[in-house]
Amino acid sequence: MYFKKLNIKIDIPDYEVGEKQLEYGINIDDKFNGLWYSDLKVNDQIDLIPEKYKSDFYLSFLEANSFILPHSDSGPTAVINFYIETNNCATQFYEIKNNAKPYQIKNQTDGCVYNLDDLIEAESFIAEPGDVYILDVSKVHSVIPLDNTEINRKAICFSTNSLSFNQVEMMFT
């Protein structure tokens, strides 16, 4: 399994986006295209993570403004994304073909990027604002715009480096 939609409803909390911590992408015509993570201060309590697991997660704010290349994440093994804005994009997961040639972009650590020719499409989903999904970000995935509207995706991310997707999923069963 690559992802799981949680059947929960959370009101969008009052939050403040802080300093940008990490970005992946390129500048085109003096505009950054890609995704970035920022510090996040949530002014309201979000009761999503069970108490005994809270220390396994860190909170950040994800923003993306373009197609996101197929990649596996650097760092986190699983994330819980609480989508704020989605802009009609699909999150597509892939299986890796034999003899694939992954590569890394600047500031990737253990994650990799893949060419589409090296991948086989697997499952996908289209998130709506307010949706909460668990993602196995150790698996290759991309974000694909489904129309030509401007992309301004936003999500509150609960990320873990210490728990697997299956362990996170079990927290909600």
Where are these regions (language model features)?
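Intrinsic-disorder/low-complexity, polar/charged segments enriched in Ser/Thr/Lys/Arg/Asp/Glu/Gln
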Residues: 1-5, 77-79, 122, 155
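N-terminal auxiliary "cap/dimerization" subdomain that precedes the catalytic jelly-roll/cupin core
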Residues: 1-43, 131, 149, 162-173
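Short, flexible loop/turn elements at secondary-structure junctions
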Residues: 7, 61-66, 79-86, 137-139, ...
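A glycine-rich, hydrophobic loop/mini-helix early in the fold
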Residues: 33-59
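Short, charged, solvent-exposed linker or helix-capping segments at domain edges/interfaces
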Residues: 49-50, 92-94, 167-170
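A short, structural micro-pattern
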Residues: 53, 76, 150-152
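Catalytic core of non-heme Fe(II) oxygenases with the double-stranded beta-helix
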Residues: 55, 62-132
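Catalytic core of Fe(II)/2-oxoglutarate
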Residues: 107-173
